[in-house]
Amino acid sequence: MVIASGDRVSTFRDFCEALRQHRDDYIILLVDSEGPVGKSPWQHLAERVGDQWRRPDAVADDQAQLMVEVMESWFFADKAALIAYYGQGFLGNSLPGQTNIELISKQDVFRALEHASQHAQKGRYRKTAHGFDLIEKIDPVRLRAASPHAARLFEEDRD
């Protein structure tokens, strides 16, 4: 089960609360890295300005998972799904050609989505209107191939 919590602070707070309330379940924190990652996820979250999150006691290393650099990066793993979702007017050929989507900066991800979707049937990309619909359409096999951190997440899939 995936529970979207909203902003980063709420997500971490909800993760910690879920750990307390569901001690027998394997709870995973999944957040945007918001930048390049050169360390373990918990170390990245502990050192990231704005987070400084301490790994809770009795929580395994693999219970922190990152979308590098942002959730929207994952869309580029399956450009066919993006093109099908937005329909006519979507400029799929203008998307970055990088095969490792984690190497595309957050700024370039949003710039490319904005440009490619500007004349699309669904209109310009908006996270609240399009983000969660789109993420459901991404092929997990393509995502694992394009993102080492997504591959790590799927390796840890417990159910």
Regions found by a protein language model. Give the residues of each.
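RNase H-like polynucleotidyl transferase catalytic core
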Residues: 5
